[in-house]
């Protein structure tokens, strides 16, 4: 009788660990993540907010717009609309911010956390929209919608 319990428990645990990061997010956050991931490979254009080219805050604004959430256009203003969370407690859908002074007023870049230590960003003209890892280019702080 003891053998079936571990056999039953193991597949359940394996199944629970399999979903992709976007499916772990719920509701609008999953929609925002899926939208942003669908833009990977597209061009970066300063001030861009469409399939013709994205900049960092244009991408995050559009992703959340598709999810029914209104965000300001500028990265620093987006930081103002979030509640700060620890980088150790990130959840898919959180916004990641890079700042030259550690505060919202110094924010110069924003990306969307997708889970598993990864985020999607409109990086720069050379890289375009891509998935990057926190280990390779860590943000200064994060905010939750």
Region locations from a protein language model:
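N-terminal low-complexity, Pro/Thr-rich disordered segments
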Residues: 1-31
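Peptidoglycan cell-wall recognition and remodeling modules
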Residues: 21-145
């Amino acid at each position: 009788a003891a053998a079936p319990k571990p056999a039953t428990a193991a597949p359940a645990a394996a199944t629970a660990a399999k979903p992709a990061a976007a499916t772990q997010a719920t509701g609008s956050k999953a929609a925002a993540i899926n939208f942003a991931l669908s833009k990977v490979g597209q061009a970066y254009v300063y001030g861009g907010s469409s399939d013709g080219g994205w900049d960092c805050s244009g991408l995050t604004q559009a992703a959340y717009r598709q999810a029914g959430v209104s965000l300001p256009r500028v990265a620093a203003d987006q930081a103002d609309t979030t509640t700060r969370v620890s980088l150790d407690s990130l959840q898919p859908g959180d916004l990641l911010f890079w700042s030259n002074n550690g505060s919202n007023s110094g924010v110069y870049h924003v990306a969307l956390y997708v889970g598993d230590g990864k985020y999607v960003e409109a990086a720069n003209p050379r890289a375009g929209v891509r998935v990057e890892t926190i280990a390779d280019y860590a943000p200064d702080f994060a905010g939750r919608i």
